[in-house]
Amino acid sequence: MSGKLYRTDLGDELATGIVSAARTSLGDTLRSVLYFTPSAFDILYLRQDLYDSTADARDAKAQLVEFEQAGFSEVPVRTAIAHKESSSDIGDYEFTVRFHESGFVVRVLQRDVGVLLTIDSMDVNAFEDAAVAIQGLLHNE
């Protein structure tokens, strides 16, 4: 990964840390790791059996990223809900898990960057491990 040119302002150290955290928590069920901003995205990890080329993967993932970028506009609403003084104290937003027929998409947002993980069907408890590790990396950046 060293020396790779990114479409976002992502550095090699953070990219490596994100992939390592996801691989450690999710193992071979991990399909892809995408880092994104409101205007661009990078593929950090792609399991070998999924696409013929990186260009094919970018084309396939572009619509997913565009959909998940909407999460940036949700931040003020999520913050207001979390901090609203009422009996429904749900706490701060942490991450989103989308359930699909044959797998999952996990979205982690921190300020103006996000990470998407696509995963085969598995035990959902591992999502929290991966999301918390990635939150820590993004928060410290």
Language-model features and meaning:
Residues 1-141:
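Non-catalytic interaction/Regulatory regions outside core domains
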